[in-house]
């Protein structure tokens, strides 16, 4: 289960299973002229959307987490996320490996043995980033997730609206979109 938290709270992120929606027809683009060096540093997971039933079942218990993005030796990214789980701070690191164009990465889940694509869809580097992840846990078990990252724990209302519109364009419904509440736990520098 810790792996689930790693994935959800990291790109906040990947590898959770559950009830599935039909995937939308549109392809997700990547941030034009993505500048990886500007993307580094501290981010907060402010919003999530997923076709997984796990999110709908657990969203009331989720809270914002802190993630730190650092360069990896292979040109990819190390995403280290710290989150509250069972009243304790847990830290997990994911290696996002380069996958084609700048801003496109892949992540291999050690728990499921599946590979997920992770795309930086849009970012201004200073305030927000929209990420989209997709993959398959097995035949017929497609996984999709969108994540809103913010440089602060209080993203502007316009960013939440932008995230909601992006999620709906990807086929996510209101009940699959959640904005994570702020917490003072596990947010300090370590």
From Swiss-Prot:
Pfam families linked to this entry: Lipocalin
Residues carrying covalently attached carbohydrate according to the record: 51, 78
One Gene Ontology CC term in the entry: extracellular region
A biological process from GO: mast cell degranulation
EC code(s) of this entry: 5.3.99.2
Residues annotated as transmembrane: none
Main location: endoplasmic reticulum
GO molecular function: prostaglandin-D synthase activity; retinoid binding; small molecule binding
Keywords, comma-separated and alphabetical: Cytoplasm, Disulfide bond, Endoplasmic reticulum, Fatty acid biosynthesis, Fatty acid metabolism, Glycoprotein, Golgi apparatus, Isomerase, Lipid biosynthesis, Lipid metabolism, Mast cell degranulation, Membrane, Nucleus, Prostaglandin biosynthesis, Prostaglandin metabolism, Secreted, Signal, Transport
Catalyses which reaction(s): prostaglandin H2 = prostaglandin D2
Active site (UniProt): 65 (nucleophile)
Record-linked Gene3D superfamilies: 2.40.128.20
S-S pairs: 89-186
Record's function text: Catalyzes the conversion of PGH2 to PGD2, a prostaglandin involved in smooth muscle contraction/relaxation and a potent inhibitor of platelet aggregation. Involved in a variety of CNS functions, such as sedation, NREM sleep and PGE2-induced allodynia, and may have an anti-apoptotic role in oligodendrocytes. Binds small non-substrate lipophilic molecules, including biliverdin, bilirubin, retinal, retinoic acid and thyroid hormone, and may act as a scavenger for harmful hydrophobic molecules and as a secretory retinoid and thyroid hormone transporter.
Summary of subunit composition and partner proteins: Monomer.
Family listed: Belongs to the calycin superfamily. Lipocalin family.
Name of the molecule in the record: Prostaglandin-H2 D-isomerase
Organism from which the protein derives: Pongo pygmaeus (Bornean orangutan)
Taxonomic classification: Eukaryota, Metazoa, Chordata, Craniata, Vertebrata
């Amino acid at each position: 289960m810790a792996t689930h938290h790693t994935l959800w709270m990291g790109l906040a992120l990947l590898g959770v299973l559950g009830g599935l929606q039909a995937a939308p027809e549109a392809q997700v683009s990547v941030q034009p002229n993505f500048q990886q060096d500007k993307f580094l540093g501290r981010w907060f997971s402010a919003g999530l959307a997923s076709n997984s039933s796990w999110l709908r079942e657990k969203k009331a218990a989720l809270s914002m987490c802190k993630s730190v993005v650092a360069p990896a030796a292979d040109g990819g990214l190390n995403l280290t996320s710290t989150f509250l789980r069972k009243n304790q701070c847990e830290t997990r690191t994911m290696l996002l490996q380069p996958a084609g164009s700048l801003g496109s990465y892949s992540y291999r889940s050690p728990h499921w043995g599946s590979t997920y694509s992770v795309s930086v869809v849009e970012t201004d580097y200073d305030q927000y980033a929209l990420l989209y992840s997709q993959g398959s846990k097995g035949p017929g078990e497609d996984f999709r997730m969108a994540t809103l990252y913010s440089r602060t724990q209080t993203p502007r209302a316009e960013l939440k609206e932008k995230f909601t519109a992006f999620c709906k364009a990807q086929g996510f419904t209101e009940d699959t979109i959640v904005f994570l509440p702020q917490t003072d736990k596990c947010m300090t520098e370590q």
